[in-house]
């Protein structure tokens, strides 16, 4: 059997977790990552090509006989990187542009759910700020949610408690274009209350296999205060994702989404991330993502028993029905170490110490996000710097282990939340 060469596109903690998973596969003997980071370089040869440089990425894959390219990030998927690879006959894991719209346009995904009866919050789409304001003045119930239609680094969602806040939000998203063209269209949707749960899945266009559940912590500060971020920590599994919830979602949400995309002529191959809200009326879809979550990947992949390459190849080849996913009967918690001041303003280039503490420690992981090498020293290079993941027999044990391990790394402006997984105590 010829061993495989794999290219991973991206540079975050999610891509580090993917690289770690791929490195365990006996089918693989060479991993490249574009552009990668300091941690990924332990498993992969990092190449200085940006995630949005589609032609260069495809050239590289062709020239280096890459057998499979894995796209980690949302921007290139929504931009059509998969189509560029497929046009050259290169094997690539991820949805085409016409399917990545499931994440790329919130208005599209809301209309899809409405058309196919997939449970979600009530909403209206607007491309005219005056009409949006008129709706807010005449029909809105507060609190209400405003969402920029396009990609906005997970930050284009505003929860408005009053009409004044909502008016300011319309101005910010649609007139001041705080999120650029992502705000050309805006979704106004009813505010849902309940527990949030994330479920990741592999999809081959027809068949869907769900992974274990996880729960994210989006706000920057303890007590769910502060600004929305890309995610400050996660735990898996979610104790609130019961068998009953799973049954409901299998019946009304998961396969229904895959079938809806196929019926629209947009067969989805890759990862669908279901952001769910467990409401009093039952589970509803908050959002879809077309790739692994970050930091959800950092708690889900370490618990997966399968060879990730086998599963991804099954997706690309339309044979996912032959695969059963298996997860360890344990728990994992990830605490993000960020730069003080994230997500607004923060210093970069600060030296970090303590990585050797993770050597040969079973069940402890240090996934790199915003890191790079500078004169042989690992320094900070972003807002979210590292994801410290630990496993345990129970969620409480995993949480204690993860927080213990956060002490193993030092850097001057280290910041983290101290209440990741507090909901575990409420289960």
PLM regions: where:
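Solvent-exposed alpha-helices and their adjacent loops that cap or buttress functional pockets
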Residues: 23-24, 39-41, 93, 115-117, ...
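Internal nucleotide-binding/catalytic subdomain
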Residues: 157-297
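Active-site "cap" helix and flanking loop/linker of ATP-utilizing ligase/carboxylase catalytic domains
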Residues: 250-272, 289-361, 374
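Short acidic-hydrophobic, aromatic-tinged amphipathic segments that line or gate anion-handling sites
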Residues: 46-52, 124-128, 160
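ATP-binding N-terminal substructure of ATP-dependent carboxylate-amine bond-forming enzymes
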Residues: 1-97
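A conserved helix-loop-beta module that forms one wall/lid of the active-site cleft
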Residues: 93-156
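Generic C-terminus detector
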Residues: 371-375, 379-427
